[in-house]
Design a protein with these regions (language model features):
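Substrate-recognition element of Asp-dependent hydrolases with the DxDx(T/V) motif
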Residues: 110, 149-181, 193-195, 231
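Extracytoplasmic/secreted proteins, especially bacterial periplasmic and envelope-associated proteins
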Residues: 67, 71, 136, 144, ...
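Bacterial N-terminal signal peptides
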Residues: 5-16
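Non-catalytic pre-domain segments flanking phosphatase-related domains
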Residues: 17-106, 277-298
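Structural recognition of the beta-strand scaffold that forms the well-ordered cores
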Residues: 103-107, 113-115, 162-167, 193-196, ...
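C-terminal cap/substrate-recognition subdomain and adjoining C-terminal extension
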Residues: 174-298
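Second-shell loop/turn segments in exported
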Residues: 54-63, 135-142, 164-170, 201-204
Length: 298
């Protein structure tokens, strides 16, 4: 009897299980979509991250800078010996170089001084470039010399070459810039060797383009070499588009590595604005323009 009762109870239980399987949610039904752990953990993209990490940590950066400055050092004796040698583009050379004292023109930021810490702060704050915060960094006078720059310019100065630092830092930042350069060991005998944006110069208009300041140097000096991380450090850019930049450089390609020496800067520059135009674009608009400029060779 107990066995019969047990069998009956078991049969009802099995029927109940079958009923549940039929009328309930099938165990094999696909679960609701969920966010994968990888997607949950993915950090927000930052256009500056890879470039800044490379600039601060990659040995290759220092090797490139040192290569450029050593190549310039090898060309310097010939440039000094040839009294007709001049590195100013034709639109900036307003007179004869005969009898002029020798000089070298260098940009400051990311050419002789390393400002990557200011970009690190920008990344950690989740912020875009800000002139006020940039001014704070400049006032701290903490920028370090880039590889090879100090040795080359110091040696050039010992050979009687005046170094002019033509920078697009604001003229109000001249004192901090001079102090930073001197504390880093660069040859700055006179404050007049630092020509910031807005410096009062007679005879030419002052703007972000450096042509006016190059002309001013050229009045009294024969410019042996120019150094920079932007095309505008060498020649005036009439049309800041990728094609416009190539066009303005085309007549001077033979000077590259001989009179003009370019340094790498993946952090910022007119190369970036050339992709999207004015600086009033939002970060999203700038990223869209950058992605559109990419070529996957398909």
């Amino acid at each position: 009897m107990r066995n019969a009762a047990l069998a009956t109870a078991l049969s009802f239980a099995l029927v109940g299980c079958v009923s549940t399987r039929i009328h309930g949610t099938p165990p094999s039904a696909a679960p609701a979509p969920t966010t994968t752990p990888a997607a949950q953990d993915a950090p927000p993209a930052d256009d500056m991250l890879n470039a800044t990490v490379w600039y601060q940590t990659a040995l290759e950066r220092d090797l490139v800078y040192r290569t450029v400055y050593r190549a310039a050092a090898q060309r310097l004796p010939a440039a000094l010996a040839d009294k007709t040698w001049d590195a100013l583009p034709k639109e900036d050379r307003t007179g004869s170089v005969k009898g002029l004292k020798p000089a070298i023109i260098v940009d400051v930021d990311e050419t002789v001084l390393d400002n990557a810490p200011s970009t690190v702060r920008q990344i950690r704050d989740g912020a875009d470039f800000d002139n006020k915060e940039w001014g704070v960094w400049v006032s701290e006078r903490k920028a370090k010399p880039l590889a090879g720059a100090l040795e080359f310019l110091g040696d050039a100065a010992k050979q009687g070459v005046t170094v002019f630092y033509v920078t697009n830092r604001d003229v109000e930042q001249t004192a901090d810039t001079v102090a930073n350069l001197r504390s880093a060991g660069f040859p700055v005998a006179s404050d007049e060797q630092v020509l910031a944006r807005g410096t009062a110069l007679g005879g030419c208009a002052q703007n972000k383009e450096k042509s006016c300041r190059r002309q001013w140097v050229g009045r009294t000096h024969r410019v042996l070499m120019q150094f920079g991380d932007q095309v505008g450090d060498f020649v005036r850019i009439a049309e800041n588009t990728p094609d416009g930049r190539r066009k303005v450089m085309a007549p001077y390609m033979d000077w590259v590595g001989e009179r003009w020496f370019a340094l790498p800067n993946p952090l910022y520059g007119s190369w970036e604005a050339a992709l999207y135009g004015k600086d009033d674009k939002t970060p999203a608009q700038r990223r869209t323009a950058k992605e559109a400029a990419l070529d996957d060779a398909k």
